[in-house]
Regions:
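Alpha/beta enzyme core
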Residues: 1-121, 125-170
């Protein structure tokens, strides 16, 4: 967060635009902190994170997505801020628990450690992919061999109407 970003949060909040911040791991900025990792793993880093929460709160944000923050740190920060804390991989001590639907439904091959799959959509997608390929190959084969389209998939003018049509063409 920069001083300018807090000015923007403040400006938006003063105009009654709800602002939700994003603290902890911010994947697009992960190279700045040494990669995809928990944020707040030392006392100093946890306190710095707490200060960011307070600055966000003071600027007028109503909430913050709290991504991959140690659970005990998240619990203490959540107790000490009035903004709604939304845990994404930050344990159960935030105000709201959040996961991506893809993770909940088991729709990813390598889900993040902090997620939990409650279904197995990936298996179903694989089955759909196999069935789709089977259908497309059968369609190609029938199209090349002349089996498709067949009489059931085609229509013709009745004989007199077709002859009239041919006369009109000439």
């Amino acid at each position: 967060m920069t001083a300018r970003s807090m000015d923007i949060v403040s400006m938006l909040a003063k105009e009654d635009v709800p602002v939700m911040g994003h603290l902890g791991l911010v994947p697009r900025k992960s190279t700045w902190i040494g990669g995809l990792r928990a944020v707040g793993k030392t006392a100093d880093e946890a306190y710095e994170l707490f200060q960011k929460f307070k600055r966000l709160e003071d600027a007028g944000a109503f909430s913050a997505e709290c991504e991959v923050i140690p659970e005990n740190v998240m619990g203490e920060i959540s107790k000490r801020t009035d903004i709604v804390t939304v845990s994404l991989g930050s344990g159960k001590n935030a105000d709201v628990m959040y996961l991506f639907m893809e993770d909940i439904c088991g729709d990813t091959e390598n889900p993040p450690r902090h997620s939990k799959a409650y279904g197995n959509l990936l298996r179903l997608r694989d089955e759909i992919k196999i069935e789709r390929l089977k259908a497309l190959k059968a369609f190609k084969k029938d199209s090349i061999s002349g089996k498709f389209p067949g009489k059931k998939q085609s229509s013709n003018l009745e004989k007199k109407q077709f002859e009239k049509f041919l006369d009109q063409l000439d």
